[in-house]
């Protein structure tokens, strides 16, 4: 195993590669979320006219997927490596395949397939054309061209590449269980994450206080609305993320019915859309500072 990339070396390799392609290297956003797409570095920056190229690792929590550390491939928390490029480069798929080569995976020697899988996130009002990337029969990446984010049409189109780091590392290191992945020399994934995985699963399915979570959802929703009323986009979005994670905990606990579930998702979606619209308005007031001068003048002159 010593001659194979460790988990952290995979991250470092991807960071260096996408840095070379002009991406800013961001840090994981400090709020619970179910996917890297929900980070403000993707959700907010994918809308509006300004360019944005970023890459970051995002720990992603999905309470309903917890399995007490007993399932070798299904986790309460996993890690995504997220790349967002706006406008989408015409050669984004080629860039992706080159990133696999950097990891020691030669596309000419492996069965790499792009399987159509259009993406939708009802709770944030987001959707796009998408493909799963399968490497020798195992999904390792999700490719998406955003068409709508927060209920707003995207222009220009943002390309998102989401690597599933645990799956990628399992393949590279040739192990059957994520807990056998070598995170760093001499340190296994399970030695870091197995106990937290068990504890979070037990909490999500058995211990969480449903009444408290229901109350928290109401509080977070009202606080998001209050922040938005003051034009405070980023604090409001933090509370949208808190609403989303709280709902996921309630869902894992079986505390919401099918009908109630749709209602909660609609409430989160309403907040996310309000945040998206307010964010674009905020950037416009600032004069879309990330645009080049000619584009900014032309765009603002249209209004």
Curated annotation (Swiss-Prot):
GO biological process, one term: glycyl-tRNA aminoacylation
Major place of residence: cytoplasm
UniProt keyword annotation of Cytoplasm present: yes
CDD domains listed in its UniProt record: GlyRS_alpha_core
Subcellular location: Cytoplasm
Keyword line: Aminoacyl-tRNA synthetase, ATP-binding, Cytoplasm, Ligase, Nucleotide-binding, Protein biosynthesis
Reactions it catalyzes: tRNA(Gly) + glycine + ATP = glycyl-tRNA(Gly) + AMP + diphosphate
Disulfide feature: none
EC number(s) given by UniProt: 6.1.1.14
GO molecular function, a single term: ATP binding
Tagged with keyword Cytoplasm: yes
Coiled-coil regions listed: none
Pfam families given in the database record: tRNA-synt_2e (PF02091)
Entry GO CC: cytosol
HAMAP family per the UniProt record, alphabetical: Gly_tRNA_synth_alpha (MF_00254)
NCBIfam families registered for this protein in UniProt: glyQ (TIGR00388), PRK09348.1 (NF006827)
Family, similarity comment: Belongs to the class-II aminoacyl-tRNA synthetase family.
Subunit field text: Tetramer of two alpha and two beta subunits.
Name of this chain's protein: Glycine--tRNA ligase alpha subunit
Gene name per UniProt: glyQ
């Amino acid at each position: 195993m010593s001659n194979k990339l460790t988990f952290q070396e995979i991250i470092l390799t991807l960071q260096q590669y996408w840095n070379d392609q002009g991406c800013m290297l961001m840090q994981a956003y400090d709020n619970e979320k179910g996917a890297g797409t929900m980070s403000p570095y993707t959700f907010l920056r994918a809308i509006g006219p300004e360019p944005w190229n970023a890459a970051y690792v995002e720990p992603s929590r999905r309470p309903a997927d917890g399995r007490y550390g007993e399932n070798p491939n299904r986790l309460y928390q996993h890690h995504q490596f997220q790349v967002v490029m706006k406008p989408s480069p015409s050669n984004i798929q080629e860039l992706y395949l080159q990133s696999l080569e950097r990891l020691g995976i030669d596309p000419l020697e492996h069965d790499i397939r792009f399987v159509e899988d259009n993406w939708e996130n009802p709770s944030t009002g987001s959707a796009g054309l998408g493909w799963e990337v399968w490497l020798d029969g195992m999904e390792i990446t999700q490719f998406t061209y955003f068409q709508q984010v927060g209920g707003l049409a995207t222009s220009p189109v943002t390309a998102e590449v989401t690597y599933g780091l645990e799956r990628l590392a399992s393949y590279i290191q040739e192990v059957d269980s994520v807990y056998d992945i070598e995170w760093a020399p001499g340190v296994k994934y399970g030695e870091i994450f197995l106990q937290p995985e068990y504890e979070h699963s037990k909490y999500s399915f058995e211990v969480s206080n449903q009444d408290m979570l229901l109350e928290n959802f109401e509080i977070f929703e009202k606080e998001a609305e209050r922040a938005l009323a003051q034009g405070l986009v980023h604090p409001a979005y933090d509370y949208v993320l808190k609403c989303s994670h709280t709902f996921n905990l309630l869902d894992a606990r079986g505390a919401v019915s099918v009908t109630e579930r749709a209602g909660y998702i609609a409430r989160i979606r309403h907040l996310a859309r309000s945040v998206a619209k307010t964010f674009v308005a905020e950037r416009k007031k600032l004069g879309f500072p990330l645009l080049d001068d000619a584009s900014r003048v032309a765009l603002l002159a249209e209004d």
